[in-house]
Amino acid sequence: VGFEITKESYAGAIKGITIGKGDAAITVGGQTSYPFYQFEGEMPNKPVVAMEIWDIEPAEWPEAAIAPFKDVVGDPAAWAKKCVEEYGADLIVLQLKSIDPNDQDASPEDAAATVKKVLGAINVPLIVWGCAAPAKDEDVLKKIAEECQGESLILGPVEEKNHKGIGAAAMGYGHSIISSSPIDVNLAKQINILLENLGMPLDKVLVDPTTGGLGYGMEYSYSVMERLTMAAMTQGDDKLQLPMINNLGNEVWKCKEAKQTVEDAPELGDPERRGILMEAVGAVSYLMAGSSILIMRHPESIKLAKAFINLISDGGTALDVAPITKQLDDVEIDFAALAAEADLTMETEKKAAPAKKTAAPKKEAAPAATPEAPKAAPVNNADAVEAAAKSLGIDLAALLKKRGCSKEDIEHTAQQHKLTVEQVIQKLNS
């Protein structure tokens, strides 16, 4: 009998969505099964990796994250061009950090000018990501949508508070959007319903379920993404049958563990390799949860993520994947010196210390013998029955003859039924 893989049947599929324009356009989504379950369905479009750039020079990035871009971090257009030409980015994500009202609070006009410069430097689709302040994002993204009409941008994040303004601008000027919700299946569906009611075609919408870095945050995000995928695929919920996008790099590299130097945490090993692997592990996790677009930062992390995508999609061996290429100097860590000193003495070799001689404790005087209680005289049950009958004024001999019983029978009956002898005699006499 041949072996057959048990296959799940699906009630729905993820919509295929095309982003960008012309020859540079990319289609994501379109799968008819769970992520990479190609034995159950089709996955016509592999997940893609978008490289992030910032519109300002990052002040708090760890050295490992800055190193690949140290010559271009002050120029967003040059930065984007390097990501495409040198590192093979499928898409570019422009993070508008300058517009944060709590930071530089740059104007919509300045942000739009930066977007135009970046568009002129690349030939791949561009995602424009706001600062997650709903009111400011609405003002800025509406202006960018207008200034970049026909460029097929992807604008986000779009929340319930600003979906009308950004959604209308995206529809009017020919852009796609990213609907964002705070790690909640129902809220993710709700924002898509609101956008559809507004008139936004769902084939122009990507879903941002909110992304956590490694650890507790990622577990939350992963769980919600699985539930979104299950609702779309097995329950046929058309409001959730949309490709998902994860802003991963921004979350991983701001973690304390990704920033700590070898002096701060020598036990965590080489900081450069550590950060790269943290981002790569996060990427694999989100790919398995159903991500169609990963926003990442470090070129070496991206290399590992793309290798995973190709291996799991097309087969092959991971032995062909090039090792991590370091850009910073190697660090020397004496892990043996960090470890606690081990006690290698065998248990049988350890000699117990001789016990100290102590004076023998004084013997306590034996307690005086308790005098034995006098033994009670044995009770004559027959006498007790006769005494009871006499006290009741009953002729015991005549009663026993009449009832055909003995004194022992009366005593036994009293014990069995928990009665007094007097009660038994009275019952026999009645």
Language-model segments: which ranges?
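Acidic (Asp/Glu)-rich catalytic clusters
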Residues: 84-87, 115-121, 142-149, 166-173, ...
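N-terminal amphipathic alpha-helix/helix-capping segment at the start of soluble metabolic enzymes
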Residues: 1-70, 332-348, 354, 359-360, ...
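Glycine-rich, proline-tolerant flexible connector loops at the mouths of alpha/beta enzymes
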Residues: 60-67, 88-117, 122, 128-134, ...
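Catalytic domains of carbohydrate-active enzymes, especially glycoside hydrolases
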Residues: 71-97
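Catalytic alpha/beta core domains of metabolic enzymes, predominantly
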Residues: 161-308
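Hydrophobic faces of well-ordered beta-strands that scaffold small-molecule active sites
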Residues: 47-53, 90-94, 126-130, 151-157, ...
